Amino acid sequence: MFSRNAASSRAIPVEKMIEQVEKNPVIPIHWGKAQKGMQAYEVLDWETAKLCECTWLLARRDVIKNVRLMLGCGLHKQIANRLLEPWMWITVIVTGNEGAWNNFFALRCHHEAEPHIQKIAGMAREVRSQSIPQKLSA
């Protein structure tokens, strides 16, 4: 079983969030073609993928503009920040026993896993393989 916690966008000032989203936005690493089923086995050609990436970033620009408009109306950050979430990175702390991690890696490092979680799971597996656990005294 995992125990996890993630940083809350509700706690971050909107302008700080906007700055993060402008400087280092999340951009998809896999632009899959539309097809039946849960997996996009085929990817868009390079030119179409670049067009999608540009459109993704234009959507970010439009959302930032609209967030600032709503802030001008007095909207609280807990709502305004929600609109920025598709482009933001978050910090998550996860703990689990060996069985939980082995199960997670079996499912999420699998070739049919969603590409973005597959990438993150692979990175976590690599870090875990290099970790040397230390028993702490009470």
Where are these regions (language model features)?
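A conserved ligand/cofactor-binding region detector
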Residues: M1-A138
